[in-house]
């Protein structure tokens, strides 16, 4: 039986909020089987919980933001959510003493280290997957994203920025998902932004924690980070990271083919909602025998950084 996974122990880290610029403490705790992914704001009295759910994503302007019925929000969840998807963590309580998850270095890599440091424990309950049965496509102008059936989880992402530092040879990335592939190829890819946009956001009291330490920053001609890029195609890899985090808002690893052109948090979420709303387009499955499971999901807890 392919089993559900949680953490062996709780673990804590402190970072900076991307938009507030304030110190944020993040605590990750083990959870019982079938709990799912639960975000919790402990700075509220009483604490407010946000189960990871496609319908709870109600703001995708600058990041993926969960908002409850009372208008309380928790922002910038996508990088941590991607790390959970990458390592196949089904059940976890995520506590944060602020309205946003700390940005860390702008990638999912610090969260991978944190989760592996806490340890991953299998639970004696079958892990469930969402298997795509029929094609689903969402379009917005020239942007689009789609799911198709596939025996595994394949991602194909294309960006299209007209910028001297983003050549046409680094605008597409394709990956067959596995924990190993995610950790080595995707998790270290950092978020990025353009200097003129960051300056405007900061003038509006946003992105106050944004810096060259937690983002790739571009002016009109070049990349401003002294150390350059971690991968020549780091920007499109980060967009794939975002998509993995956004799609894991359903709470299950996906078995299917995901392809996107110029997609972002909003379109990723619309695609996920469209899939879940069409009951004939997907099914919830579990596997008794490792021989039956797509290869990429066989041993998500065993990775080498």
From Swiss-Prot:
The active site is at 265 (proton donor). InterPro entries: Ribosomal_Su5_D2-typ_SF, UDP-acyl_GlcNac_deAcase, UDP-acyl_GlcNac_deAcase_C, UDP-acyl_N-AcGlcN_deAcase_N. This is UDP-3-O-acyl-N-acetylglucosamine deacetylase. The lineage of its organism: Bacteria, Pseudomonadati, Pseudomonadota, Gammaproteobacteria, Pasteurellales. Belongs to the LpxC family. Its cofactor is Zn(2+). Zn(2+) binds at residues 79, 238, 242. Catalyzes the hydrolysis of UDP-3-O-myristoyl-N-acetylglucosamine to form UDP-3-O-myristoylglucosamine and acetate, the committed step in lipid A biosynthesis. Pathway: Glycolipid biosynthesis; lipid IV(A) biosynthesis; lipid IV(A) from (3R)-3-hydroxytetradecanoyl-[acyl-carrier-protein] and UDP-N-acetyl-alpha-D-glucosamine: step 2/6. GO terms for molecular function: metal ion binding; UDP-3-O-acyl-N-acetylglucosamine deacetylase activity. It comes from Histophilus somni (strain 2336) (Haemophilus somnus). GO terms for biological process: lipid A biosynthetic process. Its EC number is 3.5.1.108. One of its GO terms (cellular component) is membrane. Pfam families: LpxC. It catalyses: a UDP-3-O-[(3R)-3-hydroxyacyl]-N-acetyl-alpha-D-glucosamine + H2O = a UDP-3-O-[(3R)-3-hydroxyacyl]-alpha-D-glucosamine + acetate. Gene3D superfamilies: lpxc deacetylase, domain 1, lpxc deacetylase, domain 2. Keywords: Hydrolase, Lipid A biosynthesis, Lipid biosynthesis, Lipid metabolism, Metal-binding, Zinc.
């Amino acid at each position: 039986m392919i089993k559900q996974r949680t953490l062996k122990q709780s673990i804590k880290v402190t970072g900076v909020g991307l938009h507030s610029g304030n110190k944020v403490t993040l605590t990750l705790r083990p959870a019982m089987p079938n709990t799912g992914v639960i975000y919790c704001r402990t700075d509220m009295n009483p604490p407010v919980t946000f189960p990871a759910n496609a319908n709870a994503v109600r703001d995708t302007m600058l990041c993926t933001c969960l908002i409850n019925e009372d208008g309380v929000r928790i922002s910038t969840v996508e990088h941590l959510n991607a790390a959970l998807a990458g390592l196949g963590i089904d059940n976890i309580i995520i506590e944060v003493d602020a309205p946003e998850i700390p940005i860390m270095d702008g990638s999912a890599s610090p969260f991978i280290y944190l989760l592996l440091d806490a340890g991953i424990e299998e639970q004696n309950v079958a892990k469930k997957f969402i298997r795509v049965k029929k094609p689903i496509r969402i379009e917005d102008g020239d942007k689009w994203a789609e799911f198709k059936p596939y025996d595994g989880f394949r991602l194909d992402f294309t960006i299209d920025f007209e910028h001297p530092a983003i050549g046409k040879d680094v605008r597409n990335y394709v990956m067959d998902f596995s924990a190993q592939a995610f950790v080595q190829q995707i998790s270290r890819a950092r978020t990025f932004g353009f200097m003129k946009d960051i300056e405007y956001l900061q003038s509006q009291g946003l992105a106050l924690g944004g810096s060259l330490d937690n983002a790739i920053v571009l002016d009109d001609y070049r990349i401003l980070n002294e150390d350059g890029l971690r991968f020549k195609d780091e920007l499109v890899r980060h967009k794939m990271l975002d998509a993995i985090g956004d799609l894991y808002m359903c709470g299950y690893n996906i078995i299917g083919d995901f392809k996107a052109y110029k997609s972002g948090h909003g379109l990723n979420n619309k695609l996920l909602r469209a899939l879940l709303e069409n009951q004939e387009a997907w099914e919830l499955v579990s596997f008794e025998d490792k021989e039956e499971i797509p290869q990429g999901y066989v041993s998500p807890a065993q990775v080498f950084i």
